[in-house]
């Protein structure tokens, strides 16, 4: 094999840095040639016959490469912790080792290559390796073989020891995995030094011989040749450990057993395999270089060799993602990943060993990358202009729905819209909501709109998302909305809706304090509008029905409990001709006048008797007026109290009343004049009780109980005697009254009219009345005053068809006057008066049970009786007698009560038998007169 030619005298010889022998193809690959001064690199490939290449490789390795040999060490059977085993060196190598790593955790390797035990061990045989790495990054593996020392041999002397050392030859055994037939194949020959002096035969046992896999290795007992009988899989058995023994012809073991380790040399017979999860997520619009995930793969071939060196390659989507060829980490290649364009990306990944060489084994798989949503799309309106219609005065109703489109993930904050009326809602007439299902904007009217003021409202609606915009230059969008207000027939409206009036308290009744008018929104005038009060807690104001004028009806008192913060509210109702209504509020701001004087709060006070020391009490006053008609107060002591009492410590509303000199216990009357700031006030009496106090509570004395004896004086005894005499007289009077009481007289009443007519059994013929109509007098004159006060009289006047005027009277006077438009139905029955009134859209019905009808019925009956008996003609009982009949009324259920209607053809007086017990005495008198002719 040759290096590339070079110009003579210009460049030094190139250095071959790396060669590779392809066992499968039988080629040598010269990967790198470096010229020292320029570091130029050339790659050359030469092909030759397999045998020639193999020979060249052996010669090349002999000259240039480093091949550490296995190290055989004999140690005691029991090795303590910290025991030095041996030192690893790279004999014949120019490389400088920088790190050592033991494959057995029971041993550690120091920086100088010395191997030391980490714990106490019992060793018969043991094998492990040390990985050595030089300063250029290349590494070698040194095999360490431990065997137990033979103590007997050590005691026999130096000759025996020297013989034991050369008893077995070094045994660097290895086989290539998956070797091709034919089998068996020779592996290595073993020989014992005893074979020089003895005829020996060899026996092997252990793994691969007498243990699984049984029979893989065979031994020629005479020659010591170890053979392999079949292909070996390194991934299952990277090495085989068995022992060899030497026996003489008498089957005596002539030497110590030899531990044999057969290493299986790896070939690239396993393709890389994917491991772990290949489903990844990353946000759309993420920055370039953002880590997406890592593809993991393994190769069963020998680690840290080209056979297991994996290279990761993306097969597609290379414009969106990139992959680290050595680690398999996938990263975003740009910041333009768009979930709305493609929410999942299926990326093909190839994993190839041999560092990605064309002859490397490979596998392919798919990584699924899901793009998560960010709010990179604002909601957009489907129309450029929206319109809606609503009737005026409607509130809390839906006006219109505004649809939008949003490409972001549904039902996430990136998709959910939030709406706002950004223009035209200065008065707060509207509110916006979002339909959670359709994401539409819902426009509601929360305050009624006025067609007369704004028939058309131009609004602007803006749509946003719950989440802020990310990774986009787009802005929130707005759309105009035209809302047409429809006119409706409205009721009257007060302007202003709340009117404030300043009034002084105690204004005279009838004083006009203002006018509160309502206007028809359509006509802009107040014609035909009537005004009524809805609320007026104190009945202080009256409203003129036709004009809305407000007048004082009762005393306005600022200090009343109905007044709050000097204001008093009245609600007025306006009604137009179509019965539509509107309400307004009048707030009276009552101004204070000096109509109250200061009043002492507690006119009865207790003063503690302190013996020789003077005492005092606090006198407090209040005035319900406000400043300047109240505090500070002026306190003055009555003129006669000089020398007894004095006032001190005067404040705005209190004064201290103090004794001039100590006073004995007792009641004292102290006049004190209290005036407000305007000098208005009067003299008031303070009753001061001087007593021996049990205690004082907040400066107020609590007097003790007074001991007193009760005895009767002369007047008391006299009062008791007089009371006894009066009681005795009362008892005598009651006894007399009970013993002289008259018996009750039972009077029967068959007709039921005796409850009103007076009984009389002493009637006799008297002067007959000529004109019976004299008894037809008004009922109110018949009924006495005591009965009249309990009876309601009705006087009716029919003014026109379909129109009825009526007045109601009571003992207190006229209490109602009405004129009805649709007539009145009334009727009299025995014991009932019914009156139905229809009009003004209301129904009123009055039913009064009274005895007035009974009086009228009996009066009619008596009129006819007296008219008959008042006739003076001799033939007054004749059939052709002219008879007078009174007005029986309307609808009488008793029928005719004419006294003469039951007379027969004869002039007999038998009809009197049917008149009842009330008129039998009169009938008897008349009948007797007729028979006697008197």
From Swiss-Prot:
Disruption phenotype: Morpholino knockdowns show increased embryonic lethality, with embryos that die developing one of two clear phenotypes following developmental arrest at 10 hpf. The first group show severe epiboly arrest with desmosomal cadherins and enveloping layer becoming detached from the external yolk syncytial layer that continued to undergo epiboly. This results in a population of cells at the animal pole which maintain cell division and some gastrulation movements. In the second phenotype the enveloping layer is attached to the yolk but does not progress through epiboly.
Disulfide bonds: none
InterPro entries tied to this protein: Cadherin, Cadherin-like_dom, Cadherin-like_sf, Cadherin_CS, Cadherin_pro_dom, Cadherin_Y-type_LIR, Catenin-bd_sf, Desmosomal_cadherin
GO biological process terms, semicolon-separated: cell-cell adhesion; convergent extension involved in gastrulation; desmosome assembly; epiboly involved in gastrulation with mouth forming second; heart contraction; heart development; heart morphogenesis; homophilic cell adhesion via plasma membrane adhesion molecules
Cytoplasmic side: 738-934
Domain Cadherin: 167-274, 274-381, 382-494, 495-600
Domain of life: Eukaryota
Tissue: Expressed at low levels in the brain and heart.
Subcellular location(s) of the protein: Cell junction, Desmosome; Cell membrane
Membrane-side (Extracellular) residue stretches: 167-716
Keyword Repeat applies: yes
Gene3D superfamilies assigned: Cadherins (2.60.40.60), TCF3-CBD (Catenin binding domain) (4.10.900.10)
Membrane topology according to the record: Single-pass type I membrane protein
Keywords, comma-separated and alphabetical: Calcium, Cell adhesion, Cell junction, Cell membrane, Glycoprotein, Membrane, Metal-binding, Repeat, Signal, Transmembrane, Transmembrane helix
List of glycosylated residues: 197, 296, 316, 509, 565, 569
Any one Gene Ontology molecular-function term assigned to this protein's record: calcium ion binding
Function: A component of desmosome cell-cell junctions which are required for positive regulation of cellular adhesion. Involved in the interaction of plaque proteins and intermediate filaments mediating cell-cell adhesion. Involved in the formation and structural organization of desmosome cell-cell junctions during embryonic development. Required for embryogenesis, specifically for progression of epiboly and normal convergence-extension movements during gastrulation. Required for the development of desmosomal-rich midlines in the heart.
Protein name: Desmocollin 2-like protein
Protein species of origin: Danio rerio
Gene name, Swiss-Prot/TrEMBL: dsc2l
């Amino acid at each position: 094999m040759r290096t590339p030619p070079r110009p003579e005298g210009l460049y030094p010889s190139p250095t071959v840095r790396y060669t590779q022998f392809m066992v499968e193809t039988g080629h040598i690959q010269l990967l790198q040639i470096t010229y020292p001064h320029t570091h130029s690199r050339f790659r050359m490939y030469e092909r030759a016959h397999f045998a020639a290449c193999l020979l060249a490789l052996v010669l090349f390795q002999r000259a240039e490469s480093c091949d550490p040999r296995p190290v055989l060490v004999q140690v005691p059977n029991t090795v303590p912790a910290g025991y030095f085993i041996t030192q690893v060196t790279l004999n014949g190598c120019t490389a400088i080792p920088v790190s050592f790593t033991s494959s057995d955790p029971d041993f550690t390797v120091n920086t100088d290559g010395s191997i030391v035990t980490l714990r106490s061990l019992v060793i018969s045989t043991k094998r492990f390796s040390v990985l050595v790495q030089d300063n250029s990054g290349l590494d070698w593996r040194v095999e360490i073989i431990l065997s137990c020392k033979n103590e007997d041999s050590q005691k026999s002397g130096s000759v025996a020891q020297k013989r034991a050392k050369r008893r077995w030859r070094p045994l660097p055994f290895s086989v290539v995995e998956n070797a091709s037939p034919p089998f068996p194949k020779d592996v290595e020959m073993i020989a014992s030094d005893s074979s020089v002096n003895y005829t020996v035969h060899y026996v092997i046992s252990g793994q691969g011989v007498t243990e699984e896999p049984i029979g893989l290795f065979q031994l020629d007992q005479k020659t010591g040749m170890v053979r392999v009988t079949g292909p070996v899989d390194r991934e299952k058995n990277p090495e085989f450990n068995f022992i060899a023994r030497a026996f003489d012809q008498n089957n005596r073991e002539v030497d110590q057993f030899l531990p044999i380790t057969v290493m299986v040399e790896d070939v690239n017979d396993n393709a890389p395999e994917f491991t772990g999860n290949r489903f990844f997520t990353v946000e759309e619009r993420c920055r370039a270089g953002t880590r997406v995930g890592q593809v993991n793969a393994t190769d069963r071939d020998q680690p840290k060799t080209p056979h297991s060196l994996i290279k990761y390659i993306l097969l597609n989507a290379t414009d969106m993602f990139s992959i680290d060829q050595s680690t398999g980490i996938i990263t975003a290649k740009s910041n333009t990943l768009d979930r709305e364009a493609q929410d999942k990306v299926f990326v093909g990944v190839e994993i190839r060993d041999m560092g990605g060489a064309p002859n490397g084994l490979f596998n392919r798989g798919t990584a699924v990358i899901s793009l998560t949503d960010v709010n990179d799309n604002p909601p957009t309106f489907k129309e450029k202009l929206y319109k809606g219609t609503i009737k005026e005065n409607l509130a809390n109703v839906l006006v219109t729905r505004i649809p939008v489109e949003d490409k972001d993930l549904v039902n996430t904050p990136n998709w959910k819209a939030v709406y706002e009326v950004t223009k035209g809602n200065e008065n707060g007439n509207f509110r916006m909501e979002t339909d959670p299902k359709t994401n539409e904007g819902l426009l509601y009217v929360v305050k009624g709109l006025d067609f007369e003021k704004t028939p058309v409202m131009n609004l602007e609606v803006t749509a946003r998302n719950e989440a802020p915009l990310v990774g986009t230059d787009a802005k929130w969008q707005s759309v105009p909305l035209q809302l047409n207000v429809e006119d409706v027939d409205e009721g009257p409206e007060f302007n202003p809706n709340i009117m404030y009036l300043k009034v002084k308290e105690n204004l005279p009744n009838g004083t006009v304090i203002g006018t509160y008018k309502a206007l028809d929104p359509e006509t802009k005038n107040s014609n035909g509008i009537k005004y009524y009060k809805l609320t007026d807690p104190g009945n202080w104001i009256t409203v003129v029905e036709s004009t809305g004028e407000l007048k004082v009806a009762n005393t306005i008192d600022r200090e009343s409990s109905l007044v709050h913060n000097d204001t008093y509210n009245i609600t007025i109702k306006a009604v137009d001709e179509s019965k539509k209504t509107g309400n307004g509020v009048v707030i009276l701001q009552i101004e204070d006048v000096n109509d109250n004087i200061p009043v002492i709060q507690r006119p009865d006070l207790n003063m503690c008797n302190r013996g020789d020391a003077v005492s005092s009490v606090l006198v407090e006053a209040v005035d319900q007026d406000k400043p300047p008609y109240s505090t500070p107060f002026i306190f003055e002591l009555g003129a006669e109290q000089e020398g007894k009492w004095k006032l001190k410590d005067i404040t705005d509303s209190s004064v201290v009343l103090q004794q001039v000199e100590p006073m004995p216990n007792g009641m004292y009357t102290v006049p004190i004049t209290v005036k407000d700031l305007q000098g208005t006030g009067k003299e008031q009496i303070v009753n001061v009780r001087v007593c021996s106090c049990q205690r004082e509570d907040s400066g107020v004395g609590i007097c003790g109980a007074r001991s007193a004896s009760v005895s009767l004086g002369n007047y008391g005894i006299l009062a008791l005697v007089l009371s006894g005499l009066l009681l005795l007289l009362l008892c005598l009077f009651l006894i007399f009254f009970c013993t002289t009481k008259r018996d009750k007289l039972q009077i029967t009443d068959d007709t039921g009219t005796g409850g009103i007519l007076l009984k009389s059994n002493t009637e006799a013929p008297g002067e007959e009345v000529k004109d019976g109509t004299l008894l037809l007098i008004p009922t109110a004159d018949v009924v006495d005053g005591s009965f009249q006060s309990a009876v309601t009289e009705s006087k009716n006047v029919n003014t026109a068809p379909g129109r009825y005027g009526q007045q109601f009277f009571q003992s207190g006077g006229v209490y109602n006057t009405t004129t009805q438009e649709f007539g009145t139905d009334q009727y009299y029955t025995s014991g009932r008066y019914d009156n139905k009134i229809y009009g003004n859209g209301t129904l009123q019905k009055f039913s009064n049970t009274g005895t007035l009808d009974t009086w009228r019925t009996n009066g009619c009956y008596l009129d006819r009786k007296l008219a008959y008996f008042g006739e003076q003609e001799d033939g007054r009982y004749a059939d052709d007698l002219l008879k007078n009949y009174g007005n029986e009324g309307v609808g009488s259920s008793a029928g005719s009560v004419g006294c003469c209607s039951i007379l027969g053809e004869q002039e007999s007086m038998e009809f009197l038998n049917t008149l009842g017990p009330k008129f039998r005495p009169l009938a008897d008198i008349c009948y007797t007169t007729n028979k006697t002719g008197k």
